Regions:
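Secondary-structure boundary elements
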Residues: 1-162, 198
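Surface beta-strand/loop "capping" patches
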Residues: 254-260
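Hydrophobic/aromatic-rich core segments of domains that either
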Residues: 116, 121-137, 147-157, 163, ...
C-alpha cells in the first residue's frame, strides 16, 4: 500500500522525547498547578536533552493500520476531497504525528468526537465551509494560555482532555480535529518576526484549488473572499510536512519543512 510506504519511508527521522521529567510536567499542566516555585524548578530542566525514542523502533503495525484506515475513510467519504490527490492526502490528512510528541491513538479519539458533529451540521461539498463548522466546535473550549516552559509537543490525547499551551498547542489541536474529519490542513510558522522577535505558528487549509487559506478557530474564519492574515509581520515562513523536504531539510534539522 502506497500510504504505508509513504509513512515508513519518512519515518526514520521522527521521534519523541521521554523521561520522568516530562511525565511530571504533563501532570502539573493537566492539574494546572502552575505556581511560581514549580515553574522556576522546571525552567532549569533541558527537556530537549532528554532521550529520544524513534518511531521506527517502537511503532506497531496495528497503530499504523488504524491510522491509515481512518485517514482513508474520511478522504473517500467527504466530497471536497475529490480534488485532493494522493500526494496531498499523504501530507495533509494521513500523518500519524505532528512533531516530537509521544505517539498516541489521537485519530480515533478526534474522529469519534468531531465527525458526528460535522455530519450533523453540514452535508455539502465546500471544504471551507466544513472547516468553519469544525472551527465552531473547537472554539467552544478555550485554550488555557501558558508560555512559561519550553517543552516538546504534547500528544493528541493529552491535548484533547487538557487544552493548555500557546499558539503551538492551539494549532496542534486544530490539526488533529481537522485531519480526523478529512479536512486537509497544515501548520505553518516563522522562527523570527521582525516585529516582536519571536516564534509563531498558525493553521492553513488546503482549498480545492490548491490554495492555502490561513485560519484560527474563534479568531479568523477560513474564507476565499479575501486574503486572510493575522496582521503579524512575518519573516521567512515554513510549512510543517511529514515527508522530508530536500530543499530545506538540512537547514531545519532534516525534518519536513517547506518554504511557503
Amino acid at each position: 500500500m502506497e500510504a504505508a510506504r509513504f509513512l515508513i519511508r519518512n519515518m526514520p527521522h521522527w521521534y519523541a522525547y521521554e523521561g520522568w521529567q516530562l511525565d511530571s510536567v504533563r501532570q502539573m499542566l493537566a492539574l494546572r498547578k502552575l505556581d511560581k516555585e514549580s515553574i522556576k524548578k522546571w525552567k532549569q530542566v533541558s527537556f530537549y536533552s532528554l532521550p529520544k525514542v524513534y518511531d521506527a523502533q517502537v511503532i506497531t503495525s496495528n497503530y499504523l493500520i488504524e491510522n491509515i484506515d481512518l485517514a482513508f475513510k474520511v478522504w473517500k467519504k467527504y466530497p471536497w476531497n475529490r480534488s485532493l490527490d494522493f500526494d496531498d492526502f499523504c501530507e495533509f490528512i494521513l500523518p500519524y504525528r505532528i512533531d516530537n510528541e509521544p505517539l498516541s491513538s489521537w485519530r480515533k479519539l478526534y474522529y469519534e468526537h468531531y465527525t458526528p458533529i460535522l455530519d450533523s451540521l453540514y452535508h455539502g461539498e465546500d471544504v471551507v465551509y466544513a472547516c468553519r463548522m469544525v472551527c465552531g466546535e473547537l472554539k467552544k473550549r478555550e485554550l488555557y494560555y501558558f508560555t512559561e516552559l519550553i517543552i516538546p509537543h504534547m500528544d493528541g490525547e493529552f491535548l484533547y482532555h487538557h487544552r493548555i499551551g500557546y499558539c503551538r498547542e492551539s494549532c496542534d489541536i486544530t490539526l488533529y480535529a481537522m485531519r480526523a474529519c478529512g479536512i486537509p490542513v497544515a501548520t505553518e510558522f516563522f522562527r523570527y518576526s521582525p516585529e516582536y522577535q519571536h516564534y509563531h505558528t498558525w493553521n492553513t487549509l488546503r482549498d480545492t484549488t490548491g490554495r492555502f487559506i490561513l485560519f484560527e478557530p474563534g479568531k479568523i474564519d477560513p474564507t476565499r473572499d479575501k486574503i486572510t492574515t493575522d496582521n503579524r509581520k512575518k519573516g521567512k515562513a515554513y510549512r510543517y510536512c511529514f515527508g522530508e523536504q530536500k530543499s530545506t531539510a538540512l537547514l531545519l534539522n532534516r525534518k519536513g519543512y517547506r518554504n511557503t
